[in-house]
UniProtKB/Swiss-Prot annotation:
This is ATP-dependent protease ATPase subunit HslU. Coiled coil: none annotated. It comes from Dechloromonas aromatica (strain RCB). Belongs to the ClpX chaperone family. HslU subfamily. A double ring-shaped homohexamer of HslV is capped on each side by a ring-shaped HslU homohexamer. The assembly of the HslU/HslV complex is dependent on binding of ATP. PANTHER family: ATP-DEPENDENT CLP PROTEASE ATP-BINDING SUBUNIT CLPX-LIKE, MITOCHONDRIAL-RELATED, ATP-DEPENDENT PROTEASE ATPASE SUBUNIT HSLU. ATP binds at residues 18, 60-65, 259, 324, 396.
Length: 446
């Protein structure tokens, strides 16, 4: 669980997402409240439930990006899923309880990796000893303990010399035959949608077949060390403890980001068979409110899992959701459409902005891209104009505009004489001016 303050979380999000202060503030407070709850004494702690968030805003303004960045900051079990993947129980498709099962699987994987990393030093020592045993097999006869200790001392000296060479990488390319755990039997099982848990159990049965067997492999010492280190680290990790900690982390600190919630809202003007849209909403109700989900790792309570939902709601409204589900998301945040100034910031001020990405890509072929301020401004204006004239797809429009702008440069990169390209307003107008002015062309090309 992260111990960052709301200000620090917002500051971190600012490096990647432009504007949307209200949304950033809401998720930062929600994330900090996870830590605050953990500091409260036990009787009251159980009564403090998370306040779920609904983010409303047009496409391409940063809703999903906030989720992606939040996943890295949370340091807690986190899953991002699309509401459109699920169907009502009884229909063909995935039911909503698989959200929690997937969250548990991800948490266990994350906890196991962390536990193996903590055991890395001990595992490396054990792997080193196994390699040395292969390089210098010890011959111990029946009178080993009665023999002169000089031979043992000589062996130890030789072993230390080889250990030094091994650590300095002098033996990396030498090939050795090592005994490693044989891979478990992999079986691809195709099951009807909604029966993922049964499939996992059957696959687990197949994987246990042949477990513990050894297999001889010829590898370079560098590869063998890595393989043996992973094997030794896995031996040192207590799987039961990992599963127990992961389940506890999911129940107490889990976060589910539910994207595209608007797509399962039933629009008032729609009639006919509305296949399971309302059914999915009804199935989500107990999950969001707090229920117990059966998984292969035991029963998981969802009472303290934080749900953050988002949707564009351009064809439907939040009020089109069933009232019970609306009540489960007490905090509502509206995200703003992007302005020309926002587009400029996206192109220049974020940590991995598009201009830097294209500069780095073309630099690999010796082409130096230089973006001038008026060129950036013109790019932002064109992206904004096309959004206004056609469909508003937010910051995603910049990808289309940038690709079209640098199409020829990307194609000709590597040619003799093409080593520097200046992107100013004149260059942007030459490449994109006509397309932006012609609404029919921009509708299909930009």
């Amino acid at each position: 669980m992260t111990t960052m303050t709301p200000q620090e979380i917002v500051s971190e999000l600012d490096k990647h997402i432009v504007g949307q202060k209200n949304a950033k503030k809401a998720v930062a407070i929600a994330l900090r409240n996870r830590w605050r709850r953990s500091q409260v004494a036990e009787p009251l702690r159980q009564e403090i439930t998370p306040k779920n968030i609904l983010m409303i805003g047009p496409t391409g303004v940063g809703k999903t990006e906030i989720a992606r960045r939040l996943a890295r900051l949370a340091n807690a079990p986190f899953i991002k899923i699309e509401a459109t993947k699920f169907t009502e129980v009884g229909y063909v498709g995935r039911d909503v309880e698989t959200i929690i099962r997937d969250l548990v699987e991800m948490a266990i994987k994350s906890h196991r990796e962390r536990a193996m990393k903590a055991m890395r030093a001990r595992a490396e020592d054990a792997a080193e000893e196994r390699i040395l045993d292969v390089l210098l097999p010890t011959v111990r006869g029946p009178n080993f303990f009665a023999e002169n200790s000089e031979s043992t001392a000589a062996e130890n000296t030789t072993r230390q010399k080889f250990r030094k060479k091994l650590r300095e990488g002098e033996l990396d390319d030498k090939e050795v035959d090592i005994e490693v755990a044989a891979p478990s039997l992999q079986a691809e099982i195709f099951a009807p949608p909604g029966m993922e848990e049964l499939t996992q159990q059957i696959q687990g049965m197949f994987q246990s077949v042949g477990g513990g067997k050894k297999k001889s492999r010829k590898l370079s010492i560098k590869e063998a060390l890595k393989l043996l280190t992973d094997e030794e680290a896995a031996k040192l990790v207590n799987d039961d403890d990992v599963k127990q900690e992961a389940v506890k982390a999911v129940e107490q600190n889990g976060i589910v980001f539910l994207d595209e919630l608007d797509k399962i809202a039933s629009r008032s003007e729609m009639h006919g068979a509305d296949v399971s849209r309302q059914g999915v909403q009804r199935d989500l109700l107990p999950l969001v409110e707090g229920t117990t989900v059966s998984t292969k790792y035991g029963m998981i309570k969802t009472d303290h899992i934080l749900f953050i939902a988002s949707g564009a709601f351009h064809l439907s409204k939040p009020s089109d959701l069933i009232p019970e589900l609306q009540g489960r998301f007490p905090i509502r945040v509206e995200l703003d459409s992007l302005s020309v100034a926002d587009f400029e910031c996206i192109l220049t001020q974020t940590d991995a902005c598009l201009t830097r990405q294209y500069q780095a890509l073309l630099e690999t072929e010796g082409v130096q891209l230089e973006f001038v301020e008026d060129g950036i401004r013109r790019l932002a204006e064109i992206a904004f104009q096309v959004n206004e004239k056609t469909e508003n797809i937010g910051a995603r429009r910049l990808h289309t505009v940038m690709e079209k702008l640098l199409e020829e440069v990307s194609f000709d990169a590597g040619k003799v004489g093409l080593d520097k390209v200046l992107i100013d307003a004149a260059y942007v107008n030459t490449k994109l001016g006509e397309l932006a002015a012609d609404e029919d062309l921009s509708r299909y090309v930009l």
